[in-house]
Amino acid sequence: KPICDAVANHPKRRNFIATHPIAGTEFSGPSAAIKGLFKGKTNIICEVEKTTFKLQEKALELFKEMGMRIRYMDPKSHDKHIAYVSHLSHISSFMLGKTVINKEKDEQDIFDMAGSGFESTVRLAKSSPAMWTPIFKQNKKQVVKTLEEYIANLSNFKELLVNDDYEAIYSEMQNVNKIREILNGMNAKK
């Protein structure tokens, strides 16, 4: 939303198309380019009605050539949803990495004991702070909301553990396992 707001009154606003390709890695810069990165990925387009039809056609042709799926969304919805599925993932990864680095002062212990689960969970902690700090700043309101919910879920899990309520822990994890079908559905669309 802040980007759309920033260009709202620009005299050439109709020559701007607000897009957010949902694709990337933890690396940044030209050396991190990956051929085919956008193939099968979603590209969110906001406020398409404010862009000239000719530019829309050109952009859609380019996105189609890249193999992207298009999803139209208003900027507020984009910011809300992206805070859950992207921003929170990055924060979780950064903070898990911080927790382990602060606790495990011996790097060899981390190296020897960390398996693929840990590696995949902290992969995003390798992301560029120069890129992510402004993202968190721009979407602060939504990021704070998602963090509050996430922290409440972590606190609830901790409480269940403290109270030896392993049935509830099992049930929580079983309910969250539904994410598997969602992710499998995403992968099937690619």
Describe these PLM feature segments.
Residues 32-37, 134:
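Short, flexible, solvent-exposed loop/turn segments with mixed acidic/basic and small polar residues
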Residues 35-123:
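Internal alpha-helical scaffold of NAD(P)-dependent oxidoreductase catalytic cores
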Residues 107-176:
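Interdomain hinge/lid region at the active-site interface
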Residues 181-190:
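Long, positively charged, glycine-interspersed low-complexity recognition regions
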Residues 1-31:
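Rossmann-like NAD(P)(H) cofactor-binding subdomain of soluble oxidoreductases
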Residues 4, 53-57, 147:
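Conserved strand-to-helix beginnings and helix N-cap segments that scaffold or border functional pockets
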Residues 26, 51-52, 143:
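Alpha-helix N-cap/loop-to-helix initiation residues
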